[in-house]
Amino acid sequence: ERGTLDYRGLGGFLMHRFAARSLVLVLVPAALAPLAVGCGGGAAPPATATSAADVKGSIDAKLQSALAGAQRTEKERKRDAYRHPKETLEFFGLKDGMTVVEISPGEGWYTAVLAPVLRDHGKLVVAGGDPNGDPKSEGTKHAQALLDRFQKAPQAFDKVQSVVLKDSSWSLGAPESADMVLTFRNFHNWVEDGTTEKVLGAAFKVLKHGGVLGMTEHRANPGAPTDPKTVGDSGYMPEEAVVKIVEAAGFRLEAKSEVNANPKDTKDYPKGVWTLPPTYALGDTDHAKYESIGESDRMTLRFVKL
């Protein structure tokens, strides 16, 4: 269920519904508003440059507001202590006005943070499964849940666009149209199903030169096996292997962060990473033990398109 550009689902439903409002925002950006209003018929005062501090303050305030927003569930908020969304997105360099593509958003944990931040000044595109696809597919179930969520909270999600990914081809949008591509804890899935090259190729194509590819991933011990079965069973990838694969696709590692590190994670569990919260694959067995460990140790990597 991966591949061609398809604006069905959320994109077709919401972008049609809100097209007029979106057009106004494009034609009259907020930055030009002072030029449209004179004072007593006189010339508008000269525009002042926006400082780096103002820009940072703006995105900081938007992230804080999004994290506290009603579009997020209490269950999602409880995971902030492990996923550090504000710090992670700031590390990736999220800014007002960006076009951001999120690959494989699941049921929208990060989407619920990104959508309000980019709603008025920017664009968010989510690329995932087809809500009208095989009902037995996990991708279809996630896409249906995400679409339902979007329709229930249009105040946050009305301008999100969607791309359906299918096996026939991969496209995340027009070439060099995105400032940032993000994905969270998905790399092991691509290794397992053999789509890593397709995903990275699509990310490279949609990004502008100098654009950012930001990702988090469950981190295996250095030198751990990277064959599809081992990775699929464990859910972990060694950091050095991820960097090597991504750089071979034309990106350069610009920086890495330990904001999502967890030294308590021993990475040797009966059900792989899913033994840990929030999944607790073993149910009540040793629940307190795994709860005390917390969520997985994760690499947080920022690449740039050369």
Residue map of PLM features:
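Conserved beta-strand signature within the Rossmann-like core of class I S-adenosyl-L-methionine
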Residues: 125-127, 210-218
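A short glycine-rich, Lys/Arg-flanked "PGG" loop and its adjoining helix->strand segment in the class I
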Residues: 115-116, 196-209
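Class I SAM-dependent methyltransferase Rossmann-like catalytic core
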Residues: 62-91, 95
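Conserved class I S-adenosyl-L-methionine
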Residues: 97-106
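C-terminal motif of bacterial Sec signal peptides marking the signal peptidase cleavage site
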Residues: 34-38
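A short acidic, Gly/Pro-enriched loop at the edge of an enzyme's catalytic core
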Residues: 157, 171-181
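A short SAM/SAH-binding and catalytic strip from SAM-dependent methyltransferases
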Residues: 178-197
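Bacterial signal peptide processing site
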Residues: 40-42
